[in-house]
Amino acid sequence: MPDRIARRLTLAIAATLAVGVSRAGEPYGIGRPATPQEIAGWDIDVSPSGAGLPPGRGDVRQGEAIFADKCAACHGAHGEGKPMDRLVGGVGTLRDKKPDKTVGSFWPCATTLFDFVRRAMPLNAPQSLTPDEVYAVSAYVLFLNGIVPRDTTFDADNLAKIKMPNRNGFVSAQPPPGGGAKP
């Protein structure tokens, strides 16, 4: 009797699995596949090497005006913070109990700044800035941190070449251009 029950149980499990596998590939019958153009609109990631940076350019002067208009209400007139996070300062604090993890002290790649601003800022209108505006704001924030001079202009060819102060502070499968911590 136990063999007969075991065979029936095995057969029932196999039948259930077979039905589940056969139906797994069926669509729900709603929606449609995204077009390549629709996918391209969301494929906006930027790597530390600069791959994915869009055409465009922006300089510190332009970035200062854009920052005053679209960023200062949250990050302060000069990136000092309040009510949101500080963007400047904090160099030398990463080993402190409460380090200031700012763009200038913590972030390993300038392209990370571009990617974050492009995707998520301003907070009330993410992805609303043009590539030129994002290059300009990136230039201004890096200028405020003393990383680039006032006459800096960024574009897809030079942004990834910026050497950030904490570029060697991370262990990464994809180290920033020009080096990075080795695992």
Task: Show the residue positions of the predicted features.
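Gly/Gly-Pro-rich "capping" loops immediately C-terminal to redox-active cysteine motifs
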Residues: E64, G79-P122
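Bacterial N-terminal signal peptides
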Residues: T10-A18
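Bacterial N-terminal signal peptides that target proteins for export
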Residues: P2-T10
